[in-house]
């Protein structure tokens, strides 16, 4: 989380935290010359090298310009239009060379450090700790909300977004590239939108919607993990605080109340319109990016930096779907964590006994696929019933950040509990974009799914503080325990009865041979102690 108020100013060395990968592209790479060359290998002159011809920090041993590696293995049958979409074999439609960084160096120009490392030589460890937003102090909470709002209003210092497909990227005159500035938070929104958009098949043809590079497949957890890491690192740089961490919302609390939908947290309901946010929350002033999905799909345009209407939210208010009027239960998380397989064929939203499909929310918490079920991540989104419940615009509601941070915490805990290794992730035949070695769309420089299939504290520079629920007993287990308890009780009663019978028999054996009317030896001795005891 944000460091305490007494946090010392960072040295210039610690400020080398330029994020390691982003989308769309760095400003240096969107000139007509760079796009025509297919190379995006900016240099570090004059910041870190005196060589004006430097590329990727090669002159100081930080990296080199190298051909891109892309996944060419077969994808699943869900997408039949190979060769049409700009996002296929990402990012080769735009570039075929990028910076390949050495050791702990990272970034589009190798000028920054890998997650978890800081310093001029990227040799100092740092760990950001993600905590429950309800556990933050009032000061920490206010600083986090203020930081989000600042990110919404601050132009991204490094990256720009495309406003046209590749076929139109050079502009009407063939020499005016179609990219726009965007704020840090809206950049986060735009990358999510770009990953889920339909495939444009041409004017007058219906766009193809059976494609999603960040949902309904194995990459759901890896893509969103990097998506969050991107925002966190952007905000660390903005705040000049390498310990800044995104908090999480534990949405698995059951019931029909949103415990963070208050003005102290993420915004209460407006007193004047129940689907808008209270004017006492800064988030009521936020405007939504990428709303006009229909226009994008039919005209082949791409969402640009233009904002639209306000955030809408009506938690638990979808009366037409009672099943999404309640949040997931704590036991849903416990059950999900016990699902042993990461993913199962067809590696899609109808996979059964798949941890990924379970945490995404297309299966029952136990892992069994049921087309009528929406659970965990999906249920939390649908419960919000507004901007946060619509996939293409959901990141506009800042609750998205907290919801997905908790989802990532579940993923990280599953990796730890199951000692998961990359062999569990499908190498091929997953939906397009979801194979193990596919470069996640639209991050730059390229980041593959397998790079995010690791435990976070050891590899990604952050950890979680979470108390995980224990799993409740199911009906069969309760019956089994009851039967065993009954058998134990019967055994105890039988043992007690046996002991009583045994004691009774033992007492019979030791009954005196003489009755009470006969004097005992001791009595005779006591009456005449002078007589012989023989």
Swiss-Prot record:
Similarity-based family: Belongs to the tyrosinase family.
Compartment annotation: Melanosome membrane
Q: Show the stretches that span the lipid bilayer.
A: 478-501
Membrane-protein topology:
Single-pass type I membrane protein
Signal peptide extent? 1-23
Q: Which residues bind Zn(2+) A?
A: 192, 215, 224
The EC code for this enzyme is: 1.14.18.-
For this protein, the record's Gene3D superfamilies field holds: Di-copper center containing domain from catechol oxidase (1.10.1280.10)
* Annotated Gene Ontology cellular component terms: melanosome; melanosome membrane
Q: How is the cofactor bound?
A: Contains bound zinc ions after heterologous expression in insect cells.
Q: Where does Zn(2+) B bind?
A: 377, 381, 404
Give an example GO biological process: melanocyte differentiation
Taxonomy, superkingdom: Eukaryota
Name it: 5,6-dihydroxyindole-2-carboxylic acid oxidase
């Amino acid at each position: 989380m944000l460091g305490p108020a007494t946090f010392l100013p960072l040295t210039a060395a610690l400020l080398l935290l330029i994020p390691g990968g982003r989308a769309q592209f760095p400003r240096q790479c969107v000139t007509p010359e760079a796009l025509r060359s297919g190379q995006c290998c900016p240099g570090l002159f004059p910041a870190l090298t005196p060589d004006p011809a430097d590329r990727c920090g090669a002159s100081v041993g930080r990296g080199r310009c190298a051909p891109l590696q892309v996944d060419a293995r077969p994808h699943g049958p869900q997408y039949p239009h190979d060769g049409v979409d700009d996002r296929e074999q990402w990012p080769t439609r735009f570039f075929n060379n990028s910076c390949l960084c050495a050791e702990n160096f990272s970034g589009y120009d190798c000028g920054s450090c890998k997650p978890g490392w800081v310093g001029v030589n990227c040799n100092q460890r740092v760990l950001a700790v993600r905590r429950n937003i309800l556990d933050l102090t009032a000061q920490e909470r206010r600083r986090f909300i203020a930081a989000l709002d600042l990110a919404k209003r601050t132009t991204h210092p490094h990256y720009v977004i495309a406003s046209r497909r590749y076929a139109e990227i050079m502009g009407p005159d063939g020499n005016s590239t179609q990219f726009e500035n965007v704020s840090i938070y809206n950049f986060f929104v735009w990358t999510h939108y770009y990953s889920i958009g339909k495939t444009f098949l041409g004017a007058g043809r219906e766009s193809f919607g059976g494609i999603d590079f960040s949902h309904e497949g194995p990459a759901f957890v890896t893509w969103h993990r990097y998506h969050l890491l991107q925002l966190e690192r952007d905000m660390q740089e903005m705040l000049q605080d390498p310990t800044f961490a995104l908090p999480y919302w534990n949405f698995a609390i059951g019931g029909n109340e949103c415990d963070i939908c208050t003005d102290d947290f993420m915004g209460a309901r407006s007193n004047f319109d129940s689907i808008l946010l209270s004017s006492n929350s800064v988030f009521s002033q936020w405007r939504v990016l990428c709303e006009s999905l229909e226009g994008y799909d039919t005209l082949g345009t791409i969402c640009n930096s233009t904002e639209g209407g306000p955030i809408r939210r009506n938690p638990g208010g979808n009366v037409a779907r009672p099943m999404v009027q309640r949040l997931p239960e704590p036991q849903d998380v416990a059950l999900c964590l016990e699902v042993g397989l990461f993913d199962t064929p067809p590696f899609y939203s109808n996979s059964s006994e798949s941890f990924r499909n379970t945490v995404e929310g297309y299966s029952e918490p136990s892992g069994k696929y049921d087309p009528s079920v929406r659970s965990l991540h999906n249920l939390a989104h649908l419960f919000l019933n507004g901007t946060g419940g619509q996939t293409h615009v959901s990141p506009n509601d800042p609750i998205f950040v907290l919801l997905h941070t908790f989802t990532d915490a579940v993923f990280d805990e599953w990796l730890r509990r199951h000692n998961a290794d990359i062999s569990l992730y499908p190498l091929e035949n997953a939906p397009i974009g979801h194979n193990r070695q596919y470069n996640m769309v639209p991050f730059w420089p390229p980041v593959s799914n397998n790079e995010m299939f690791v435990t976070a504290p050891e590899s990604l520079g952050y950890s979680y503080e979470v108390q995980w629920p224990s799993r409740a007993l199911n009906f069969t287990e309760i019956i089994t325990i009851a039967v065993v308890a009954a058998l134990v009780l019967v055994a105890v009663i039988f043992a007690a009865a046996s002991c009583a019978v045994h004691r009774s028999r033992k007492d019979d054996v030791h009954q005196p041979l003489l009755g009470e009317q006969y004097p005992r030896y001791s009595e005779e001795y006591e009456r005449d102690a002078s007589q012989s005891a023989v």
